[in-house]
Curated annotation (Swiss-Prot):
Organism: Bacillus cereus (strain ATCC 14579 / DSM 31 / CCUG 7414 / JCM 2152 / NBRC 15305 / NCIMB 9373 / NCTC 2599 / NRRL B-3711)
Binding, UDP-N-acetyl-alpha-D-glucosamine: 9-12, 23, 73, 78-79, 140, 155, 170, 228, 333, 351, 366, 377
Record: active site: 363 (proton acceptor)
Region (Linker) location: 231-251
Entry-linked SUPFAM superfamilies: Nucleotide-diphospho-sugar transferases (SSF53448), Trimeric LpxA-like enzymes (SSF51161)
Domain of life, source organism: Bacteria
The protein's name: Bifunctional protein GlmU
Enzyme class at the top of the EC tree: transferase
EC number: 2.7.7.23, 2.3.1.157
Amino acid sequence: MSNRFAVILAAGKGTRMKSKLYKVLHPVCGKPMVQHVVDQVSQLGLQKLVTVVGHGAEMVQEQLGNVSEFALQAEQLGTAHAVDQAASVLANEEGTTLVICGDTPLITAETMEALLQQHKEAGAMATVLTAYIEEPAGYGRIVRNENGHVEKIVEHKDANEKELAIKEINTGTYCFDNKALFASLSKVSNDNVQGEYYLPDVIEILKNEGHIVSAYQTEQFDETLGVNDRVALSQAEIIMKNRINRKNMVNGVTIIDPSNTYISADAVIGSDTVLHPGTIIEGNTVIGSDCEIGPHTVIRDSEIGDRTTIRQSTVHDSKLGTEVSVGPFAHIRPDSVIGDEVRVGNFVEIKKTVFGNRSKASHLSYIGDAQVGEDVNLGCGSITVNYDGKNKFKTVIGNGVFIGCNSNLVAPVTVEDGAYVAAGSTITENVPSKALSVARARQVNKEDYVDQLLNKKKS
């Protein structure tokens, strides 16, 4: 196989997005558009990948990191001019170069591989990715010769009646013989209304020089969708969501209502897990097998063990073990590690806490900056008081501890193994192992007090 290279065009202003965010960084199913493209082209066995950046260059470079080399198009003078900015990296290379836009998040490695194979088999200097659509208005038409090769690409506004009837359109993705590409770029003129250098002109240059220009027609027109405004962004979101949901269902995940279930492109979900409506799985989340998630649950960048149930709750940047029960209406905040067979009940918030196996906080509790041992019971209304207005402090609860209802543990404080804390206590000092700690005022009953009070008000 000859050397392969790719150029991703990501320098456009994206003015139609009407956004402060650089266009190709707008997310589709939780991942920036350009990252979708890079992830797919990276599966093609490339020797070099160059992303052409312009506005917001630093943000794109930060997003892609060292996966790609970068070329700067400081002034946007057209697509041919954009590709030419990669000359310092690629111009002297032998091989085939794929050129694709960074705002086509739905393109797949399979389609690009088919394009490259068609290019090779046809012995072409350039190959165009095309698609057949019933309503081709606005698209450039593909005019083929008697051999089935591309004779020319005609823009809609320049097409005659016969050419307007053609329904095979140019999608804007190409592959070229690398040296022929960069040799032709220097011949492209900007003698047009916009005064720009257009990449399709390279096709005409190569054709006029007697080279074969081939085309590969994809049956997946949706993959070629370019996102230029918020309407197209929403269309891409729907298509990607359906693709992701279908893939998960085919792999053994039950999605009760796919139209109301959102799964990120990078999420991994085990078989026989059930997702109820309103479930949102974001980021690099991994969910095990035989889980039940939702309804109305958000999980982001977290790891969920097998046979875990999460109902109407939120989990962020945390790890949950096996056979955990969460919710309804619980919130597990970042940097929490929940053990196996744990119960986190309704209106419980856990933050930056290690919560041991078989421990329970069944309702109305806040556990923050804490280390909770195994087999611990935190009664209703248990609070770790971790913040003094300036600094956060740690609470340590040993194994087998029982915390009574409506108790405050004022950090820094340790409750050692097997200790009991009486309901209503405010603990400010360490509790020894197996001790009962009572930290509340003794109850006083004042006999006949109510009658005395009422008589006083009457007088």
